[in-house]
C-alpha cells in the first residue's frame, strides 16, 4: 500500500515538473502587450514628429531662399543678406543648444548610445524642443548637416517621454522604448524601415539588450513610423536615381578597389572630425558668446557658399541624384568632394544640432562617381555605368566611418530602390570596413561617446573637488 502511494506521489511530482517546464517554455516567448502597445505609440509619435521636422526645415529653407530671390537683381543686397539670414538662423540653433540642452548638439546618436547604457541623461523635456527648433535653424540655414541624427535623438527621447507619461518603471521597458524610438527615428528620416532595425542591432550592439521583447518592440515601432512617413510622403524612394544596370561578375574586382579607397578615407575622415572638434573647443573654451558667434560665422559662410556653389552646401540629398547621373566631370566631382569635406567638418564638428549621415552619403556618392567615371575611361570594354559606383560609394564611407556595413548596405538600397546592386554593395562595404579596422580606425559614434563620457567625468571630478568638504561626506 505504501509502495503504491509512493509511486503515485512520484508520478504526480513528475507531472507537476513537466507542467512547470512547459509553462516556463511558453512564457519564454511571451511579450508583455503593454510594451508592444507603448512601442506602437512611440513609433507613431516619432513618425509624426519626423515628418513635421522635415516639413519645418523645408519651410525655413524656402523662406530663406524666397527672401534671396526678391533681391537677386541687386548684388550689393544679395550677398550680405545671404550671409545675415543664414548666420541668424544658425545662431538660433547654437544658442538654444548651449543654453538649454548641451546634449542636443551634434547628431545626438552618441547620446542615445550612452543613454542605453545609463551613462547619459535623457532630459526629453529640454531636448525635444531644442533639437526640433535648433535643427530648423541650422538645417534651414543651409549648413552641411543631415536630419537623421536629430530624428534618431528625437525618437529616443520620445520613447523616454512615453515611458514617463505612462509611469512604466521597469528597466526593461526604459531600455526597450529608448531603442524603439531611435530605430523609428532613422526609419522616419530615410523611409528605410529595415535599416532602422539593423541600425539598432548593429551600430548600437554594445548597448542594445537583444531579447525577444526588445526586438519585437523595435519592429513594432519601426512599422508604425514607416506607415506614418508613407502616409504623408508616399512610397517612392527618398533618393531618385532611376533603375541602374546590374554589375557584371567580371567587374566586381573594381568594387573591391573602391572599397579599399574608402577603407583609407574613412579613418582619415574620422580623425579630421575629432581634430576639428578639438580646434573649436580651444577656440570658444565653452563660452556661450564665442560659441554662438562662431556658429553664426559658419552658418553665414554656408549661406554665401550656397550662392557660389549650391552643390557644396546643404545636406546633400539634392546633390546625390545629380552626381550619380554623371552630370559632373571627374575634376569637378573631386573639387566638390573636397569642398564638402571641409564644410562637413566645420558644421558637424562645431556642435551644431544636425546629423552627419546625409553629408557622408553625399561624399560617398561624389567619390564613388568619380571612381566610376575614371574606371569607364580606363576599361571601356566593361561598358561601366558610373551610377553603380555612386551607389556603392554611398554605403562604403558610412561603413568605414561608422563601422556599420550592414546598415550602410541596406540603407542605401532602400533609399535608392536598386536592390539588384546588393552584391557590389557587399563587396565595397566589406572591403572598406575590413581595411578601416586594419588601419586602426575607430567607429565614429563610439569615439565621440567616449570623449563625451571622459569630459563628463572630468567635469564631475572638478565639481567634487571644488565642493565644500561637508558636501562630499
UniProtKB/Swiss-Prot annotation:
Domain of life assignment: Bacteria
Per its record, the protein catalyses: 2 chloride(in) + H(+)(out) = 2 chloride(out) + H(+)(in)
Q: Its principal location?
A: membrane
* Residue ranges that the UniProt entry lists as topological domain Cytoplasmic: 1-32, 117-123, 167-176, 202-214, 282-287, 439-473
**Motif Selectivity filter part_3: which residue numbers?**
355-359
* Motif Selectivity filter part_1 mapped to chain: 106-110
Enumerate the Periplasmic topological stretches. 70-76, 233-252, 310-329, 377-386
The entry sums up its family as follows: Belongs to the chloride channel (TC 2.A.49) family. ClcA subfamily.
Q: What is this protein called?
A: H(+)/Cl(-) exchange transporter ClcA
